């Protein structure tokens, strides 16, 4: 069971970092930094593992699931927390007891089109999905296997 991949969804504002930005990077891989919510941090630090599958979700504009990624590293301390030049700088985070963590994510596939929320709401398998619950704002969310498979099947059927 320890080697069984888990499933996640990460949110990003395309104006800050989009799936196209990820696709343009060497190895199509990036550190997923700047998470400053404790529950989201706990997912990154305590639960995400290399090989887990991740949906890349665009928020604010072009809202929806834009593609599929994978976790490409084990969790490690977010270096931006100690960089005073970075907008994610946290002066209260000691170097010997990091407060914030990251994982690297690698692009697996950009979907032919972003799958919007209103379409996700039509899939019965997603009735209990965290993303679709009122007030759900967490930037890192777990996804149940059935939800993951339903979205992936929909994306492949709709966006080959």
State where each predicted segment sits.
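Short, charged beta-turn/beta-strand-edge "cap" motif at the junction between a beta-strand
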Residues: 57-63
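A short secondary-structure junction signal
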Residues: 20-22, 81-82, 116-118, 151-154
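Mixed-charge, low-complexity intrinsically disordered regions
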Residues: 2-14, 74-77, 121-122, 126-160
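Compositionally biased, charged N-terminal/linker segments
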Residues: 1-50, 147-148, 155-160
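Residues that flank catalytic or metal-binding motifs in active/ligand-binding sites
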Residues: 6, 65, 101
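Short, conserved beta-strand edge motifs with alternating hydrophobic and charged residues
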Residues: 9-11, 56-57, 68-70
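Aromatic- and Lys/Arg-enriched surface recognition patch
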Residues: 68-138
């Amino acid at each position: 069971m320890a080697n069984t991949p888990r499933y996640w969804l990460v949110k990003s504002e395309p104006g800050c970092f989009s799936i196209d930005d990820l696709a343009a990077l060497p190895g199509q891989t990036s550190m997923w930094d700047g998470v400053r919510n404790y529950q989201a941090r706990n997912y990154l630090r305590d639960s995400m593992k290399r090989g887990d599958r991740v949906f890349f979700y665009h928020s604010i504009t072009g809202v929806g699931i834009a593609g599929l990624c994978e976790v490409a590293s084990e969790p490690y301390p977010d270096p931006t927390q100690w960089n005073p030049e970075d907008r994610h700088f946290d002066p209260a985070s000691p170097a010997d007891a990091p407060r914030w963590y990251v994982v690297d994510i690698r692009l697996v596939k950009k979907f032919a089109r972003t799958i919007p929320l209103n379409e996700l709401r039509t899939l019965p398998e997603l009735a209990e999905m965290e993303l679709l619950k009122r007030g759900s704002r967490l930037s890192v969310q777990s996804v149940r296997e059935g939800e993951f498979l339903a979205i992936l099947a929909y994306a492949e059927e709709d966006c080959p």
